[in-house]
Amino acid sequence: MEGLARVFLIGGASKAVRYDEQTTIERVIHVVARGIGISQVAVAHFALRLVTGPSPQTAGSGDSLWLHPMLRITQLPHIYARHLPIGVCDEIKLEMRMRFMPQSVYELQATDSSAFVYLHEQVVDEFFSHVAWRSSVEVALEVAALKVCRDFAEHQHNKGADHHLEDLDIEACIQSLIPNVLHNPGFKHSHLKKTFTAYIKKFSATSPNESIIRSLALLLEVVKFDVELFKASLGAGWTKPVELVVGPHTGLSYRLNERCDSSRLLELRTIAEITIRKMENGSEKTLMQLNLSGAAKPVLITLSTEELSQSLAHLLDGYQMLYNQRDSVFKLKGIERCETLTMHEATIRPKTPNNIDSNIRLRRELITLKELIGGGQFGNVYKAVYHDLEKDERIAVAVKVCKTDAEPADTQLILQESSLMRNFRHSNIIQLIGVCVDQPMWLVLELAPKGELREYLQQEKDWLPLRILTLFCSQICDSLVYLHSTRFVHRDIAARNILVCSPQCVKLADFGLSRALDYDAVYTASRGKLPIKWLAPESVNYRQFSMASDVWMFGVCMWEIFSLGVKPWAGVTNSDVIMHIEQGSRPPCPEKCPTALYNFIRSKMWAIEPHKRPTVDQIYAIIEDVRQQIIQNIPPEQIIVGKPMTAAGVIVAEMSSLPGLTLYRTMEDQKRQAEEDAKWLEQEDDEDEDDQDIDQIPSTSHSSVENIRTSNGYLHHTPTSTRSLRFEDKTSRGLRRSVDGVCDAVTKLQNSFNNLTHNDDFLHSVKEVTSQLREMLIVASGMRDRVTTTTQRTDVDMTKTLIANDMKQMSRVMGKLQVNGHQATYNTLRRDVVRICGELAVNCTTLQLQLTQPPLENEFSSLLSNC
């Protein structure tokens, strides 16, 4: 999204600034300041406030809407919607003012004359707009005369015209600058004109700099431009009303009223963190908390409205940034705050899993903790800075600090989490950077600047579109596809354990409860607290966890996302949740969730029986299909959710678990079938000389199996059995060959790929896959008429949709590869391509079976007769 923002300057001039989705208020200030000749040194004194009317003069209450420097321009219409009148032009209007005053205006004159002149014009404008009518007539006339002389001299210099001050219309000058003075009953009109004329003659020879200094000296006592006043109450609650005074000389002080002396509350440079929150539901009052460097307790201040709180917080934050030369400490909802140093997100290449001591162990002295950002069962989480000596750069990271009094079992869980995370490589899973193994143990993780997803949803709920919510679901599901393909279950999938790295990227985190699955595909927990309201029934009742229980939890997580951060089962106790579930109750459909998608979550993902739930790769295909429909602007009520497809493969059974008689009968049937197939092959070879390659296809009992890796494990792609070949014609055999070609190309890509694979070789392998896929689709397009039943047609259409989604996804990833130069991200994207190719092979095999499915009535009859 791009647009133009109109920035008004003092005196009525304005600048148009082009912005995009990443343009911040801070960036606009820098651009405008540079455009009017203000140096980088003085930029920190300036701020922007939102103009809520056609111009600053008609803005009304907009003077209190000061904008956080890290706020994005595109967020303004959403955050301040109730302040912007309906029907106003879409162009965003801002006003730039100097808000953070210097210790000495004369020092500012020496360092940046342009900023000094801007401050003077601002103070004079404030005087004529709001103060002149209640000040002494002599001061008003003198300030007005100084301004007229300066403006006249500037006009003479710019135009080169030969005019004289005596030619000025004195009454018009007074009327334009201080009209209220004309109606002062204490002065006669003729006396006003005479006094004003005398001042003009007196200052006619004064230089512009001297004129500005004299004006500021006069106005300092009248306008009080170096302080701001706020009505507030110290502490929590409106119990001790005072007047707060904020300025470079007063710091943050308070006084009972205007006649009392002020008492200093704190120094502005000591402010370490600013947060504001509503006092209670239904109340306009807000509570501000100021955490101070070196202070044991925070300072609490109650203000009457949220706008007033944000204005005070903005002022205090601006002064501490000016004095400490660091970035914002004001925690405003929805704002990404910067760090002191120039840092970027920690998307550095994870260490190799070999030799944990040397490869992921970090020196504690290279890590500087900055601020507490969260806590959990095993310890607190801090924002920190890690000094990477190899690259000689400082990186913003998150540090999980284990409690010093933690039980050995809890310490073991944290060690296990680090052991798990060092092996995970996925673009939507938080990366482990390293571990400080000495007590207290530290886990150093990739930093997600925007925090937990649940809080982010609550903060940004007014602007988050359905497209973004579905994207979040898709990214989380993609990470689960990867996790399950490595035979791990997460066991704690919830919005609180999803972290937001950017407005369009979320990552799965908190692997403290993750477990590797054994061959039973079920893990039984023996201890620890469990998140009851997110758990599947079998997890609550029997403490059993599997990929199917992860699917249930992901369904609850999706519900949280579409509910914009609402907790599930609100008002229901943990002990009653399982009773509600077993009685058929489920959380209601969120307002933002498409009905068809909610029905899929309710009926499939929240099925009581674990085996009836879809796999995460099937869910991923469904979500991607829904997301594409949303991108195509299909209304939510018209969105369709297809039937989840199951990849066709070999039925795998544990031979030792079969009864002896059944095992013997199975072996005999396979032997007899192999003999019949061999005879039939010989006959077919004689009858059809055009298909010489059929006799090379092995029987079912001797076929070699090609393993194609998919996101859900392996697809055992076996060459088509001779039983199926009985029903093949030339077209069917052509489709089989083309599908085999796709599978062979994918297998070759998977077997040859690693992080060191040359890019040309990788691209050649991918082109081979797409070439074979194109051939297969050409053959398949001519076979749809063979499908006779509606159900079969629906299945074929769904599989084609899955293939199309895979191709779109691969196209997007390949596009990212062309513009991405970071090695770690580059290899992650290439692995994504390999994974998508595996999914393509699965779906192509499924399509082949659907288009060439032989009649099954006779086989069913034979099977039933053997029962």
UniProtKB/Swiss-Prot annotation:
Pfam families: FERM_C_FAK1 (PF21477), Focal_AT (PF03623), PK_Tyr_Ser-Thr (PF07714). GO terms for biological process: regulation of cellular component organization; signal complex assembly. SMART domains: B41 (SM00295), TyrKc (SM00219). Residues 674-729 are annotated as: Disordered. GO terms for cellular component: cytoskeleton; focal adhesion; plasma membrane. PROSITE patterns: FERM_3 (PS50057), PROTEIN_KINASE_ATP (PS00107), PROTEIN_KINASE_DOM (PS50011), PROTEIN_KINASE_TYR (PS00109). Residues 683-694 have a biased composition (Acidic residues). Residues 367-631 form the Protein kinase domain. InterPro entries: Band_41_domain, FAK1-like_FERM_C, FAK1/PYK2_FERM_C, FERM/acyl-CoA-bd_prot_sf, FERM_2, FERM_domain, Focal_adhe_kin_target_dom_sf, Focal_adhesion_kin_target_dom. Residues 698-724 have a biased composition (Polar residues). The keyword Nucleotide-binding applies. Residues 662-691 form a coiled coil. Has apparently no tyrosine kinase activity in vitro when expressed in mammalian cells. PANTHER family: TYROSINE-PROTEIN KINASE. This is Inactive tyrosine-protein kinase kin-32. It comes from Caenorhabditis elegans.
